[in-house]
Amino acid sequence: MTTFLGNPVTFTGKQLQVGDTAHDFSLTATDLSKKTLADFAGKKKVLSIIPSIDTGVCSTQTRRFNQELSDLDNTVVITVSVDLPFAQGKWCAAEGIENAVMLSDYFDHSFGRDYAVLINEWHLLARAVLVLDENNTVTYAEYVDNINTEPDYDAAIAAVKNL
């Protein structure tokens, strides 16, 4: 059972598992351009999915993955939330993180539904980490049961480094 703020929450759709092919998406970047999975073709991808960049745990998660994985060759960390692109950009500027890929599902929540992370009761995204290989195959998946807690950074980072 997944909880948010101590309460059970529900989702629509089926969570991706190791071996699944990731769904394409169309998300809004901080410059308001549209980004799809194809924009990151040929790269290893870490989808760091968070409820809101303006919370402590989400901020920590975003900072940690970007700090620890930004130097890996052929790897991109993609942070996804339903925050407005302006808020995502403001956070990056305040944190001094210049090369973070921040994408927003604010417009139609299609990413949240397709990846089964849209919290029905709150219309926020649940906390999850998905590692995709260069062919968009899921090689690591963690859907955090208590959304108010951090993911298993070490396991996710090891999964990327082992690709």
Swiss-Prot record:
Q: What is its EC number?
A: 1.11.1.24
Q: Which UniProt keywords apply?
A: Antioxidant, Disulfide bond, Oxidoreductase, Peroxidase, Redox-active center
Oxidoreductase is among the record's keywords: yes
GO MF: thioredoxin peroxidase activity
Q: Which cysteines are joined by disulfide bonds?
A: 58-92
Q: Which domain of life is it from?
A: Bacteria
SUPFAM superfamilies given for it? Answer: Thioredoxin-like
Matching InterPro entries = Redoxin, Thioredoxin-like_sf, Thioredoxin_domain, TPX, Tpx_CS, Tpx_Peroxidase_subfamily
Reaction(s) catalysed by this chain's protein: a hydroperoxide + [thioredoxin]-dithiol = an alcohol + [thioredoxin]-disulfide + H2O
Cite the HAMAP family for this sequence: Tpx
- Relate the protein's function as given in its record: Thiol-specific peroxidase that catalyzes the reduction of hydrogen peroxide and organic hydroperoxides to water and alcohols, respectively. Plays a role in cell protection against oxidative stress by detoxifying peroxides.
The UniProt entry's sequence similarity note says:
Belongs to the peroxiredoxin family. Tpx subfamily.
Further facts:
The active site is a conserved redox-active cysteine residue, the peroxidatic cysteine (C(P)), which makes the nucleophilic attack on the peroxide substrate. The peroxide oxidizes the C(P)-SH to cysteine sulfenic acid (C(P)-SOH), which then reacts with another cysteine residue, the resolving cysteine (C(R)), to form a disulfide bridge. The disulfide is subsequently reduced by an appropriate electron donor to complete the catalytic cycle. In this atypical 2-Cys peroxiredoxin, C(R) is present in the same subunit to form an intramolecular disulfide.
Q: What is this protein called?
A: Thiol peroxidase
Which source organism does the UniProt entry give?
Streptococcus gordonii
